[in-house]
C-alpha cells in the first residue's frame, strides 16, 4: 500500500477501536428516526437504460485538497436528484476527505435515491454503522481487504440490506474480487499508490469481468467521449465526483457529458 493509504488504514483501525469502546450511536437530532427501507443501489443502476450515473458529494481529497469550499451536501444531493442521476455517493471519511457520517444521514433523508457510503471499510462494525446511518450500499476496497474479508463483509452487508461495490485498480485485485463472489465491481481509474489517473484502467479490466457482473468506472471521467466509450464497452455506471463539484452547475456538466 502507499504511504497515504497506509495512513488512512491506520486511522481506520483507531476509529474502529473507538467505535468498539463507545458503541454505535446516531446524532441526537436523528436518534428517534429510523432510515427508510433499503432502496436497492445495484438495482437502481441496472434498471436504467444506458450508462447510469453515481454522482458524488465530495468536499476534499488527499491528492487535490479542498474541492468545494461552500459544501452543502443536502443542496448538492437534491441538485443531483433533479438532474436525473441514478444514485449518490457520500464521502464519510473525516480526516482525509473532510467527510462526515452526518452527511450520509442528511442526504438519505433529503432525497429518494439510493446512497453509497464511500469510506475505507476494514471491520464489520463499520457495516453496522453504515446500516444505522441509512446507507443503501457500502464500498469495499480490494487493496486493503483480503478475499475472505471481501466475501464475508459483502455477505454481512447483504444481511443488513445493503449492496457492496467492490473496488479494484488492477488485474490482481480484480481476480481477488471475482474469487470473493462480488456482484458489483468498481474500477478505480486512480492508482491509490501514487494517485495518478488512467481511464484506460477500466477498459483493461472490463475484458476480465463476466458480462453478468455490473461494472462501475470511477475517477478521472471528465469528457463526454469517456462516457460514450464506457457505454460502448458495456460498463454499467460511472461514478463522477470532482468533475461535478468543480465545474459549476451539475445539470450543465451532466448535460454536456451526456450529449450524443
UniProtKB/Swiss-Prot annotation:
InterPro entries: Aldolase_TIM (IPR013785), Indole-3-glycerol_P_synth (IPR045186), Indole-3-glycerol_P_synth_dom (IPR013798), RibuloseP-bd_barrel (IPR011060)
Gene Ontology BP annotations: L-tryptophan biosynthetic process
SS bonds (residue pairs): none
Catalytic activity, EC: 4.1.1.48
Any matching Pfam family: IGPS
Presence of the UniProt keyword Metal-binding in the record: no
GO molecular function terms noted in the UniProt entry: indole-3-glycerol-phosphate synthase activity; phosphoribosylanthranilate isomerase activity
Domain of life of the organism encoding this protein: Bacteria
Record-linked NCBIfam families: PRK00278.2-4
Family that this chain belongs to: Belongs to the TrpC family.
Matching HAMAP family: IGPS_B
Protein name: Indole-3-glycerol phosphate synthase
Organism expressing this protein natively: Desulfotalea psychrophila (strain LSv54 / DSM 12343)
Amino acid at each position: 500500500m502507499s504511504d497515504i493509504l497506509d495512513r488512512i488504514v491506520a486511522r481506520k483501525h483507531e476509529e474502529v477501536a473507538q467505535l468498539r469502546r463507545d458503541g454505535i450511536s446516531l446524532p441526537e437530532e436523528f436518534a428517534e428516526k429510523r432510515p427508510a427501507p433499503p432502496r436497492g443501489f445495484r438495482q437502481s443502476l441496472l434498471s436504467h437504460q444506458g450508462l447510469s450515473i453515481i454522482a458524488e458529494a465530495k468536499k476534499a481529497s488527499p491528492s487535490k485538497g479542498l474541492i468545494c469550499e461552500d459544501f452543502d451536501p443536502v443542496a448538492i444531493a437534491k441538485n443531483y436528484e433533479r438532474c436525473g442521476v441514478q444514485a449518490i455517493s457520500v464521502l464519510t471519511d473525516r480526516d482525509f476527505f473532510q467527510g462526515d457520517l452526518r452527511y450520509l444521514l442528511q442526504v438519505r433523508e433529503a432525497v429518494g435515491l439510493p446512497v453509497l457510503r464511500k469510506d475505507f471499510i476494514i471491520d464489520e462494525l463499520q457495516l453496522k454503522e453504515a446500516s444505522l446511518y441509512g446507507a443503501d450500499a457500502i464500498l469495499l476496497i480490494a487493496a486493503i481487504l483480503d478475499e475472505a474479508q471481501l466475501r464475508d463483509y459483502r455477505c454481512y452487508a447483504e444481511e443488513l440490506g445493503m449492496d457492496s461495490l467492490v473496488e479494484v485498480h488492477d488485474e490482481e485485485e480484480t481476480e481477488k474480487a471475482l474469487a470473493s463472489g462480488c456482484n458489483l465491481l468498481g474500477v478505480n481509474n486512480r492508482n491509490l499508490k501514487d494517485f495518478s489517473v488512467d481511464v484506460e484502467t477500466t477498459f483493461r479490466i472490463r475484458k476480465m469481468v463476466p458480462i453478468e457482473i455490473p461494472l462501475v468506472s470511477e475517477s478521472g471521467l471528465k469528457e463526454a467521449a469517456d462516457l460514450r466509450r464506457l457505454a460502448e464497452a458495456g460498463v454499467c455506471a460511472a461514478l463522477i465526483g470532482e468533475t461535478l463539484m468543480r465545474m459549476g452547475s451539475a445539470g450543465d456538466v451532466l448535460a454536456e457529458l451526456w450529449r450524443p
